[in-house]
Amino acid sequence: MKEWRRNILGRELVVQYGKVAKQSSGSALVRFGDTVVLATANISDKAVEGIDFVPLTVEFQERFYAAGKIPGGFIKREGKPSESAILSARLIDRPIRPLFPKKLRNEVQVIVTVLSVDPNVPPDVVGIFAASLALNVSKIPFEGIVAGIRVGYRDGQFIALPSEEDIEKGLMDITVAGTKDAVTMVEGEAKEVTEEDMVKALRFAHSVIKELVDFQEEILSEFNVEKIPVVEPTPPEGLVEAFKDLLNKEELERRILVKVKKEREVALKEYEEQLLNQIAEKLSVTDLEGIKPFVSELYEDAVKKTMRRLIVEKGIRADGRKPTEIRPISCEVGLFPRTHGSALFTRGETQSLGIVTLGAPMDVQIIDTLLEEGVKRFMLHYNFPPFCTGEVKPLRGPSRREIGHGHLAERALKNMLPPEEEFPYTIRVVSEILESNGSSSMATVCSGSLALMDAGVPIKKHVAGIAMGLILEEDAEIILTDIIGMEDHYGDMDFKVAGTRDGITAFQMDCKVSGVSDELLMKALMQAREARMYILDRMYETISAPRPHLSKYAPIIKVTKVDPEKVADVIGPGGRVIKKIIKDFDVKVEIDDETGLVKVVGSSEENVDKAIELIREIAKEIEVGEVLEGKVTRIEPYGLFIEVRPGKIGLLHQSKVGEDMRQFLKKVKVGDTIKVQVINIDDLGRLQFKRVTEGENTQHGKTHSKRN
């Protein structure tokens, strides 16, 4: 067993190797502060046939024992990965995936298991460090060292590993990963920060990343691991030369420049089939399937180089646009009669339908994860059905990609929402991607913002998003605005920026190259800002402010406050009082025991108002001398029990009935209404009444009765 230690950011970072998981090809047990993770890396013996990508899987296992908790619910063990675990797995996957050899076809599985968790040291950040180490000490081909860090921004200072208070009171929460040379991955949210501050944050993060990578280099200097060779199949003799001879570059250009996505795909596929047949004929090959993978690989490379060359040399993109040009945009709101808010945002061949549903406070999402307990009142769900790209696939639950895209759009919008005190509704936004050709997550931000205003949610400002790309050649750096799927696939960087007219609210970046300079990143962010302003103008033209009224189909929520000491009276013995209010007025009621805040939800404003009025009445202090009307609930030989408010029952003793006591007691029955005056409240809160007859002056009652 080997162990290495280094103090970083005022915490001890400890790495152990050879103590646990020794049968794994690579493993690392890493402790940073009180967070401990185990990362393992393994590879299959055989390559997977018929694929053209690295078959990498990253799993992030949350173990509740790491936080000293037992899982909630009926089943007391961890089940399928939670949404937070999936997001953490994606966060680890993104910086390590580009570092595998492009021709690797053996299955690789990286598993990060959280064994102990410190709230101020995110396990996913430690997981990036541990996964990098596990891969580098394994026999798996892996070409680099990466690390990650979480960064906050508060009171003008950047903070590495910020506390929850720093995040809540600060302006930024981003996770950054990279190599010793450059930042390669960013994911996070902000409260309208400037582009300059974002670049400074990445520079600050990279200074910490370099120290983390340096520590890994120190550890890895003690290892001399022989990596598995990546076996590349050799194409048949003469195939590469035949492909070069038969490829017509002008014809390929023409097909790449077909403006419509589906037509372009068909045109390119047809030309690939044509080349395959021509090569087979030239080489006298009868087994087309045998040479097809080699031809496909050569063709893919030719398409990539040609698309990039057209942009660099001629400034023309596949759909005919210039590098800074945005596709045509259209916005519509109020599409459906019964939804609470709706919007259709279309940018070229990417289209998002945003739907807003307003719910009661009790409709919140209950959160019970490794690091979080509580509720979530704003949710954004992103759906990417197969028809949006004209494909046929089985419909199952949300994919990791759908969860990740929805999370990014949610982070872009959430800081523009009104506080719960001003708008007590639970808010759900659903984005249905109806067409997709690049940047559907940023289209989701736009449709979500439009739909929120259409629903009458008092958001502070519109939020728009744009996806940017980069073509990096030895003699050129071309930044692309509003990339399509093809440019995302063949480009060197994909970064998405969302924000208002005043600043950035969400940012995501993935770099396929070794990294980009601060100057280039700043240029790209400013180009993205121009695009964002253009999109925001189109959105404000469609709907410039939240609608003044909510949909008539949205639930009605009204809020009142009672003395916390009176909450028990409102609830009543065994919940009898509150249950009766709920039943009588067809409402839902939520009461905060500590603050006395009462939320009443219903479909009828009249009923909600009546319920609120009754709750206030119940919570109102009953005073000695007060005259009330109540119903007889019980008759005893010594007097009557009268309920003057729900749950508030007192005694009208026979001696307090008045001169016609006997005649009155003979006639009275349960359910009769009687006017009484409170003459005493004892130490236990029990009420004593006297009967008030018609025309009786009761003002004197307050002066010579007292509350004991």
From Swiss-Prot:
One of its GO terms (cellular component) is cytosol. Its main location: cytoplasm. It is an enzyme of class 2 (transferase). Keywords: Cytoplasm, Magnesium, Metal-binding, Nucleotidyltransferase, RNA-binding, Transferase. GO terms for molecular function: 3'-5'-RNA exonuclease activity; magnesium ion binding; polyribonucleotide nucleotidyltransferase activity; RNA binding. PANTHER family: POLYRIBONUCLEOTIDE NUCLEOTIDYLTRANSFERASE, POLYRIBONUCLEOTIDE NUCLEOTIDYLTRANSFERASE 1, MITOCHONDRIAL. Belongs to the polyribonucleotide nucleotidyltransferase family. HAMAP family: PNPase. This is Polyribonucleotide nucleotidyltransferase.
